[in-house]
């Protein structure tokens, strides 16, 4: 989830946009034939990641998607003034049944 590395093609990074933008991105990947995608978020965006997965799983593709794995953790982030703080992270892997 660092900004310096390229993002794999099956990853949706959650940020400040509306949830439906990320739902559309996930659905697009699944419709292109990707069998498994990973939704990643950190900090305040974690709730959007959970919402994204639940909307895809329950509203758009019921009985066709399963949650493969959920990983939670934290990252140390250094602010502009040099202070370090921890930010929670989540990665939710979903796949077609």
Curated annotation (Swiss-Prot):
The modification Glutamate methyl ester (Glu) is found at residue 69. Signal peptide: none annotated. The modification N6,N6,N6-trimethyllysine is found at residue 16. The modification N6-methyllysine is found at residues 16, 40, 64, 97. The modification N-acetylserine is found at residue 2. The modification N6,N6-dimethyllysine is found at residue 16. Changing residue 16 to E: Decreases DNA binding affinity. Unable to repress transcription. Abolishes acetylation. It is an enzyme of class 3 (hydrolase). One of its GO terms (cellular component) is chromosome. One of its GO terms (molecular function) is nuclease activity. Its EC number is 3.1.-.-. InterPro entries: Alba-like_dom_sf, DNA/RNA-bd_Alba, DNA/RNA-bd_Alba-like. It holds the Pfam family Alba. Binds double-stranded DNA tightly but without sequence specificity. Involved in DNA compaction. Possesses DNA endonuclease activity. Prevents transcription after DNA binding. Binds single-stranded DNA and RNA in vitro. Binds rRNA and mRNA in vivo. May play a role in maintaining the structural and functional stability of RNA, and, perhaps, ribosomes. Binds double-stranded RNA (dsRNA) and exhibits RNA chaperone activity. Required for normal growth. Belongs to the histone-like Alba family. Homodimer; homodimers assemble cooperatively on DNA with consecutive dimers binding end-to-end. May form higher order oligomers, e.g. homotetramers. Interacts with Alba 2; heterodimers lack cooperative DNA-binding behavior and result in more compact chromatin structures compared to Alba 1 homodimers. This is DNA/RNA-binding protein Alba 1. It comes from Saccharolobus solfataricus (strain ATCC 35092 / DSM 1617 / JCM 11322 / P2). The lineage of its organism: Archaea, Thermoproteota, Thermoprotei, Sulfolobales, Sulfolobaceae.
């Amino acid at each position: 989830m660092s900004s310096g590395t390229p993002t794999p093609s099956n990853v949706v990074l959650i940020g400040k946009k509306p949830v439906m933008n990320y739902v559309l991105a996930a659905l697009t990947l699944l419709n292109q034939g990707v069998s498994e995608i990973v939704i990643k978020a950190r900090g305040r965006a974690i709730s959007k990641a959970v919402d994204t997965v639940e909307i895809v799983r329950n509203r758009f593709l019921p009985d066709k998607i399963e949650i493969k794995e959920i990983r939670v953790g934290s990252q140390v982030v250094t602010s502009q003034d040099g202070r370090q703080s921890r930010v929670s992270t989540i990665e939710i892997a979903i796949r077609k049944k």
